């Protein structure tokens, strides 16, 4: 199914954009208030399926004629990750930046608290989106925080430009699920990301993405990616 949770400007801080979870989800709305409840699964490896219990509460509010804001708080609780090794959980046996203990198992579990904010308005008559996404893993003793913030500008009817800065510490979120291209994928990276998007047709679009990152917080990582997207 499509990811049911609100992610500001399609943030990939916790979930990669290509992740389509399996499981159950319930969406509830009452006036400006919305909520998303989910029981989803991460099952890349046949040896072990990780269950994720989740709850998101939020507010979607029109500030004035041209500005609206959306804010939410979410909890994502991963079931007993630290009892297992990446070989039992991820598709290729890699830990994707998360800390490992002396036995080769995950050092921490993942109980994530997530604060998200998106403001849509106009800046110099251009449709503009400001966004902020913050995550904290309460089960980790250190390197437990991550965030990304930035803006998106619709330059004209076709072109859209997006800039963001991200700092995602090694145990702030589950590395196998976060953005698979930023810093080479996984956690423990920080830096800049620039996107230029062009819709060729209503269903087909092309994105050019430049990553200017610090891989593992110290090593330069620069990559240009051309992403072709087609909506079914």
Walk through the language-model features, giving the residues of each:
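Outer membrane beta-barrel
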Residues: 1-78, 147-175
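Active-site-proximal acidic segments at structured loop/helix or strand boundaries
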Residues: 81
């Amino acid at each position: 199914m499509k990811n049911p949770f609100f992610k500001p400007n399609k943030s990939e801080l916790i979930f990669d954009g290509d992740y389509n979870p399996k499981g159950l989800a319930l969406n509830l709305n009452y006036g400006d208030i919305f909520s998303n409840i989910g029981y989803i699964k991460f099952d890349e490896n046949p040896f072990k399926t990780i269950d994720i219990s989740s709850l998101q509460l939020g507010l979607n509010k029109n500030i004035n004629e041209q500005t609206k804001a959306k804010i939410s708080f979410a909890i994502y609780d991963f079931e007993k990750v630290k009892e297992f090794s990446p070989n039992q959980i991820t598709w290729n046996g890699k830990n994707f930046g998360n800390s490992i203990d002396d036995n080769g198992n995950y050092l921490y579990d993942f109980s994530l608290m997530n604060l998200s904010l998106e403001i849509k308005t106009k800046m110099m008559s251009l449709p503009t989106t400001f966004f902020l996404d913050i995550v904290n893993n309460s089960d980790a003793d250190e390197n437990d925080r991550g965030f990304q913030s930035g803006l998106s500008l619709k330059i004209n009817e076709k072109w859209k430009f997006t800039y963001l800065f991200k700092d995602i510490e090694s145990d702030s979120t589950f590395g196998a699920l976060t953005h698979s291209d930023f810093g080479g994928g996984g956690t423990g990276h920080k830096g800049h990301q620039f996107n230029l998007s062009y819709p060729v047709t209503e269903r087909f679009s092309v994105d050019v993405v430049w990553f200017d990152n610090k891989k593992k917080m110290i090593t330069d990582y620069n990559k240009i990616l051309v992403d072709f997207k087609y909506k079914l």
